[in-house]
Amino acid sequence: MARGERRRRAAAAEGARPLERARGAGRRDGRAGGARGSAGGAALAVVVLALAFGLSGRWVLAWLGVRRALTLHPAPSALPPDSSSPAVAPEFFWGTYRPHVYFGMKTRSPKPLLTGLMWAQQGATPGTPPKLRHTCEQGDGVGPYGWEFHDGLSFGRQHIYDGALRLTTEFVKRSGGHHGGDWSWRVTVEPQASGTPSFPLVSLFFYVVTDGQEVLLPEVGAKGQLKFISGHTSELGDFRLTLLPPTTPGDTVPKHGSYNVFWSSNPGLPLLTDMVKSHLNSWFHHRPPGASPERYLGLPGSLKWEERGPSGQGQFLVQQVTLKAPFSVEFVFESGSARTGRDQASEQLVGGQLTRALESHAAAFKERFERTFQLKEKGLSPEEQALGQVALSGLLGGIGYFYGQGLVLPDTGMEGSEQKMDPSLFPPVPLFSGVPSRSFFPRGFLWDEGFHQLVVQRWDPHLTREALGHWLGLLNADGWIGREQILGDEARARVPPEFLVQRAAHANPPTLLLPVIHMLEGRAPEDLAFLRRAFPRLHAWFSWLHQSQAGPVPLSYRWRGRDLALPTLLNPKTLPSGLDDYPRASHPSAAERHLDLRCWVTLGARVLSQLAEELGETEAAAELGPLAASLEAAGSLDELHWAPELGVFADFGNHTKAVQLKSRPPQGLVRVVGRPPARLQYVDALGYVSLFPLLLQLLEPSSPRLGPLLDVLADSRHLWSPFGLRSLSASSLFYKQRNTEHDPPYWRGAVWLNINYLALGALHHYGRVEGPHKVQAAKLYRELRANVVSNVRQQYQATGFLWEQYSDQDGRGMGCRPFQGWTSLVLLIMAEEY
C-alpha cells in the first residue's frame, strides 16, 4: 500500500511539471494573439491529460503485474482434493520427509508432527562438550552416510559413519486405521573397528515436535525414563510413542541405559539443535551394574514443561538415553485408530517382529529393484548393482515435504526495475519434491526435479505424479514457477538472505517435461489421467516461458536475469539457465540469443503439441502445432545459431573474447577488456550449450549438423574425457577459470551427470536409427557409458558418496556431497533407460 502511494505521488508530480511549462508557453502565446493562445492552451491541456492517463495506465498495469505475480494460478489442481491427507493418501502421510536431518520423520501436513534423532559421543575429546549431530552438514566430519535401501514409501535402512562410530537407522511403516498407520525405528550404534578394546559412551536423543495446538502427554517412568508419550492431533487422532529399553544388537538382551528428559515449548524448528546444546550442561553418572561409573553431559532431567511459550507455539519433548556401544534402541509410533481392536502385546512392531519385517522389506526391495532395472540380468557387477541401489535409495530418501511462503520480486516488464522494489510474500504453498543434496541443497529446485523424476517414475509412477502435481501447484497467475523453493523456517534458515528472493521474470530449464515425455510414451491410464488434469497448468507454464523469454528476433529466446557486467566478474553469470557460470556473451544485452533456451522451448512446443493432440485439446493443439513446426523447421535453428566460423551451434550476443581477470591492488582481481572490442557475433564458448540440439534430440538423423557435433563431442581437445563429457572445451579461454576472485569454476570443465545422461540418451537414439552417423553414434555411446559408470562407481567405492560433479582430469568427486539428486541418473545409465 505504501509503495503504491509513493508511486501515485510520483506520477502526480511528474504530471505537474509539464502543466507548468504549458502555462508559461500559453502566456507567451497570449501576447502574440489571444485566440491562438486559447487554441494552444487547449491543445496542451489535451497533451497533459493524455500524459496523465498514460502514467496512470502504466501504474495500473504495474500494479496488476504485481498482483498476478503473487496470485496462484486459477486452473484446477493436477492432484485430487486433499491429496496429501491420510484419508486420500494414507501410504504417503508419514515419511522421512526431512532430508536435511540425518534421521527423522514427519507427516505430509502444513502443521506436521515431527520426530527426529540427535546423537553425541561422550568424552571423545576430554574437556570439551560432545559434538551434537542432528542436521546434515558439509563440514561436520560425519561421513560417509546414506541410505542403503529406501523404497520411498514404507521402509529404509541407512548407515552413518561418525568418527569411531557406525550408526544404522532403520524404519518400517505398517498400514492400518484411518490416520496413516504405525511405524517403528531401530537405531543401532556400533564401533567402526571390530575388536575395539574400549567402547565409546554414546547419547541418543529421540525427540518429538508439535507445531501448534497438538497435545503431548508424557508418562513418567523411573529415573528419567519415559514409559510412553500419548498425543492427539486433528490429523492423526490419538497416538502413542514408545522408546523401548536398549538391547544388544541382534538380540533381545537388555542393556543398562541412563535416561534424561527435556520438555519445552517449540523454539522454532531451526533452533532445535541449539536448544538441546544449551541445555546439555549438567553432569550425570552412567552406572551399569558391575561396572565403574562414567560421567556424561545430560539434559536437566525434569519433566516440567520448561520455558513455556505462547499458546499455539507447540511442544518439544526430548528423551536422552546414554550407554556404551554396541547397542540398539527401538522407537515406536502407534496410531490409535490402527491399534483399536488389536492385541497390543502381540501386534506391536518391535523386537523379533520388527527384525522380520525389516528383513522382509529388504528382500522385497532387492527383488523389485532387479525386476525394475534388470542390472544383474544385463551383466553389471555386484558392485554396480549395489551402486544402483544406493543411487535410487538416496534419491527416494531425500524426498521432502515443505510448506511455507517464498519471497518473490514481481516482473514489472522492465529489466532491472525489480531491483528498486521490495520482495513480497508468495501465498503459502506445499511442495513434495526430491532434493539435490541433503547437506547443501535440502530443498526443491525446478531444474533438478525433472531429472530426479526420470529415476523415480521408473520405480514408482505414483510418486512422480505426486511430485509433478505439487510443482505445478506453485504456478502463479502468469504461469511462472520459481526456480528455487525455500519454503518454511527450516529451509529459510539454511539459505543466505541474498539468495532467498525469487524473481518472477526469471525462468529455469523446463525439465519437468522430461518425465512428461516418458508418461506420454508409456501411455499408462493413470499417467494419461494425470496429464489430462495437469494439461492446463503445463500449457500455462510453457506459454509463460515462450512469451516472457522471447528474444530480439522471431523464434529466438533469451534468458532474463543475467548478472550485470560488474568489474569483478570475468563473465556475468546466467543463473536462470541452470548453467550458472557457463560463458555467454561478454557484454549482456537485449540482443542476445541463447541456444540452450531455444532448444528447451522447441522441446516444450513439441511435447505440449503432442500432448494436446493426445488429449483432444483442439484449441491448444491449433496454437502449439504451428509453433512447434516453425521451431523445428529445417534451417530455422541454423539461421539463428549455426556459427560457420566455429563449426558448431552457439549463442549470439555482444561479445569479445579479449577479457581476463587481472590483479589491480587494492581492489583485487578485476575484469580487463582488451581488443578487439565487443561486437554482435557468435559466442566462442564450445561446451554443453553447443550440444543442446543433439542433447534434446532435435536434429534429424540425416542432419548435416549432427556429424560436426559428434566430432566435437569425441575430441579430447574439447569435450571428451576418460570420466565423461566435460562441460567446457579444454581449449576454451574460460576452461577452469575463476569467475571472480572468490568464485571458482563451476560449469567450466567439470563433468556433470545430468548432461552426460542427456548425451547418452541422444547417442543411444542416433546409434539405433538409420542415418549416416549411426555407427559413430553407437561407438561413442558404448565408450561414454563405460567411462561414466566406471568413474562414478570408483569414486563411490573410494569415498562412500555420489558427488555433485567430477573432475575431467582425474575423475575425483567435487562440489557438495552426498549429491543423490541428478547424479542418481547413473542408475538409468547402467540400466540403459533413456
UniProtKB/Swiss-Prot annotation:
One GO biological process term is:
protein N-linked glycosylation
Q: Which reaction does it catalyse?
A: N(4)-(alpha-D-Glc-(1->2)-alpha-D-Glc-(1->3)-alpha-D-Glc-(1->3)-alpha-D-Man-(1->2)-alpha-D-Man-(1->2)-alpha-D-Man-(1->3)-[alpha-D-Man-(1->2)-alpha-D-Man-(1->3)-[alpha-D-Man-(1->2)-alpha-D-Man-(1->6)]-alpha-D-Man-(1->6)]-beta-D-Man-(1->4)-beta-D-GlcNAc-(1->4)-beta-D-GlcNAc)-L-asparaginyl-[protein] + H2O = N(4)-(alpha-D-Glc-(1->3)-alpha-D-Glc-(1->3)-alpha-D-Man-(1->2)-alpha-D-Man-(1->2)-alpha-D-Man-(1->3)-[alpha-D-Man-(1->2)-alpha-D-Man-(1->3)-[alpha-D-Man-(1->2)-alpha-D-Man-(1->6)]-alpha-D-Man-(1->6)]-beta-D-Man-(1->4)-beta-D-GlcNAc-(1->4)-beta-D-GlcNAc)-L-asparaginyl-[protein] + beta-D-glucose
E.C. number(s) listed in UniProt: 3.2.1.106
Report residues carrying sugar chains.
654
Q: Which parts of the chain does the record assign to the membrane side Cytoplasmic?
A: 1-36
Enzyme superclass (EC): hydrolase
**Active site: which residues?**
580, 804
Q: List where Basic and acidic residues composition bias occurs.
A: 17-31
Where is the protein localized? Answer: Endoplasmic reticulum membrane
Q: In which pathway does it act?
A: Glycan metabolism; N-glycan degradation
Q: Where is this region: Disordered?
A: 1-37
Main localization (coarse): endoplasmic reticulum
Provide the transmembrane region boundaries.
37-57
Topology within the bilayer: Single-pass type II membrane protein
Entry's InterPro entries? Answer: 6-hairpin_glycosidase_sf, 6hp_glycosidase-like_sf, Glyco_hydro_63_C, Glyco_hydro_63N, Glyco_hydro_63N_sf, Glycoside_hydrolase_63
Q: Which Pfam families match?
A: Glyco_hydro_63, Glyco_hydro_63N
Biased composition regions of type Basic residues, renumbered to the chain: 1-10
GO terms for MF: Glc3Man9GlcNAc2 oligosaccharide glucosidase activity
Positions of the UniProt region annotated as Required for endoplasmic reticulum targeting: 74-136
Q: Which keywords belong to this entry?
A: Endoplasmic reticulum, Glycoprotein, Glycosidase, Hydrolase, Membrane, Signal-anchor, Transmembrane, Transmembrane helix
Family that this chain belongs to: Belongs to the glycosyl hydrolase 63 family.
Task performed by this protein: In the context of N-glycan degradation, cleaves the distal alpha 1,2-linked glucose residue from the Glc(3)Man(9)GlcNAc(2) oligosaccharide precursor in a highly specific manner.
Q: What is this protein called?
A: Mannosyl-oligosaccharide glucosidase
Q: What lineage is on file? A: Eukaryota, Metazoa, Chordata, Craniata, Vertebrata
